[in-house]
Amino acid sequence: MSVVVGSGFSAAPSAAAGAADAAHDAHLALGGAPCDVALVFVGGDLVTEPAEALRVVQEILDPTELVGTTAGGLIAGEQEHEQGDGVAVWAISLGDEGRAEVFELHTTEIEDGIALSGIPAVELGATSAVILLADTAHLPLEATLNAFAEHLPGVPVIGGVPSLVPPDGRPLLRGLGQSTAAGLGIRFEGIEVLPLVSQGARPIGPELTVTAGEGAVIRELAGRPAIDVLRDTVDSLNEDDREQIRHGLLLGLVVNPGQPDYGPGDFIVRGLAGADPESGAVVVGAPVTVGQVARLHVRDPQTATTDLDDELALRRTATGSARVAGALAFTCNGRGSDMFGHANHDAEAIQAGLGPLPLVGMISAGEIGPVGGRPFAHGFTATLAVFLA
């Protein structure tokens, strides 16, 4: 038996009614296959009723593992419900060879910082992918993703940060109630999962080498003060690129050096967080190393559309003769109608590129996905976990 995915969504006025409608649709799509994992996303005003949604989903799907989160917006099918109340359910049957392990991440304050516990200790190569729901009010996300890179090297980690937290401050859900964990993860093995990260940005101008810097501070690029080099680079751009930079100056940093050429998927894109005109240093939202290649990037609706379409086409090619069983999506709350001028942009693109397929996810306050084989936190990004049958 192969992997089967079912999904459902309902905008019913109560969490119980919405969960019932969504879970019934997911149950029908499974076609009698057992539910190994169910993911529940509870949105809008219904975030105060998560236990009711979980109870109903448990009754209808009887999943081996039940996890979820509250969210400010939901993705289901071809639609993105940016503001409305609703419940979305995603259910997977892993077939004869697949397996899933749900784990909790916890943090403890220690003398010199915060200790993280809960990352699974498994053999290298045993994990297909990890889905991660991160409560960043309690989880240091960058340090956590660095720990994943160390303990599960090369494993795609895809997920998001809840964009709406209930009044009690606990957005994560497990079993029949709220979880006190700082992060909830699902580790899959024995199946094939393709990650997708669309940062919605494209490189412009020349490649520049970091020649002095530490932490998140770049002091020199190509042997000159960084701010002077960036100013000269902007001045050398054509009029269209200079116009797009007015939306915000972004810098891409190569994750894996030593390649003959670098394309959009090789850079982790970050905004410039500050500058010191006196010293010529600039601050970026990521650690830098001397010798690292950097390049200016721009982000705009057309670039974001093209980037997502290109990434989807690559995943379609990568599936070969395999069938796509379903997908989980995590998109930024800065995308959607705010970026593109209309709703459903990303969901429609995913369905056009890979569908029709069972698609569920959440509009996030931060997205998680791999670049250059390492997990990163993102903004203004669409991340996707594509499950093959």
Identify the role of each PLM range.
Residues 1-51, 56-59, 63-65, 69-340, ...:
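Small-residue-enriched flexible segments
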